[in-house]
From Swiss-Prot:
One of its GO terms (cellular component) is extracellular region. The presence of a 'disulfide through disulfide knot' structurally defines this protein as a knottin. The cysteine framework is VI/VII (C-C-CC-C-C). It is found in: Secreted. This is Conotoxin Gla(2)-TxVI/B. The modification 4-carboxyglutamate is found at E56.
Amino acid sequence: MEKLIILLLVAAVLMSTQALFQEKRTMKKIDFLSKGKADAEKQRKRNCSDDWQYCESPSDCCSWDCDVVCSG
């Protein structure tokens, strides 16, 4: 009976450490993807021209406010 309890405890510890490592890998992927998104946003802002230009979508404008022309 004691061996069974020890075996169950060892299995629980192994499962929890596996879940912990899997969570860390997921967080690294999220950090990596977020960094790329932040870099793309910085690039967009660098290429951002003045307001009152014609636009087709909010992403065309620095202010993200498009109504035929950018407004902000």
